Regions:
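Cysteine/selenocysteine-centered motifs that mediate thiol-based redox chemistry or coordinate metal-sulfur cofactors
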Residues: 181-230
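Short, surface-exposed beta-edge/turn micro-motifs
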Residues: 81, 133, 151, 184, ...
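Residues in flexible loops and secondary-structure boundaries
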Residues: 103, 144-146, 169, 192-197, ...
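Active-site bordering "gate/hinge" segments
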Residues: 1-149, 157, 165, 178
Length: 230
């Protein structure tokens, strides 16, 4: 499951390295292992779900100087904002982001301790853990399912996922296992104009103009929720 810690030997090796490339099936981006490696000065590029084809098309082919500029602008907007509102097909989800700082993931990691996805291109923020209420439709893709043929419907109150229905929603049972796993932990906006929706969340959440939310752990980017997943 994305967000679970790697073996201690792997965590130690990450911390001792100068640069770490992480082409894994599940994401290590929001783990203590990645956080501690960054504190030690390691540059880390996480690539969960990366495929050979993704190296030659889509998000990886973007002009990353432009991605970096746009990501910085959207990050500033998130930091300045106090609330976000997602509307789709008559459903509304209100998200409290007051007092939290936006985080850029431009796919450019030149300095010691810089980390993020590759390919990348998103600005994201940790909402207040009890500050999301409403309903939303997901019509792009979902971790554990892939590219959606039909939408998912989610009901959220007090920052927690209360129900999810739709295509293969049973694959998301870990989010309903407890309130910690089901906490809305991230709001993100895609900033990569070359990214393609393909069912692999690594690239899907980077598609320019899309918005995504995540559930679970957010302690690595300004939140307070530590869960079994992200």
């Amino acid at each position: 499951v994305s967000g679970q810690e790697p073996p201690k030997a792997i965590a130690a090796a990450m911390k001792a390295a100068d640069v770490v490339i992480v082409p894994t099936a599940q994401s290590l981006t929001h783990t203590n292992a990645r956080i501690e490696a960054a504190k030690a000065g390691t540059r880390v590029a996480t690539m969960p779900g990366i495929t050979k084809e993704m190296f030659s098309r889509g998000a990886m082919t973007a002009d990353y100087n432009e991605v970096e500029k746009l990501t910085a602008k959207v990050t500033e907007m998130l930091t300045r904002a106090s609330r976000a509102r997602i509307e789709k097909d008559g459903y509304v989800l209100n998200i409290n982001i007051s007092g939290r700082n936006g985080v850029p993931s431009p796919g450019v990691y030149r300095e010691a301790g810089k980390c993020g996805n590759l390919p990348s291109g998103e600005a994201y923020i940790a909402p207040l853990e009890d500050g999301s209420d409403g309903e939303m439709i997901i019509d792009g893709s979902m971790v554990g399912i892939g590219k959606l043929e039909s939408p998912l419907h989610m009901t959220i109150s007090g920052g927690k996922l209360r129900s999810v229905t739709g295509e293969k929603s049973e694959n998301l049972d870990i989010l309903l296992k407890n309130e910690i796993n089901g906490t809305v932990c991230e709001l993100g906006i895609g900033t990569n104009e070359a990214a393609i929706l393909n069912g692999i969340i690594l690239e899907d959440e980077k598609v320019y103009g899309t918005v995504h939310i995540a559930f679970g752990t957010n302690t690595s980017f300004g939140g307070t929720n530590k869960a079994e997943c992200h």
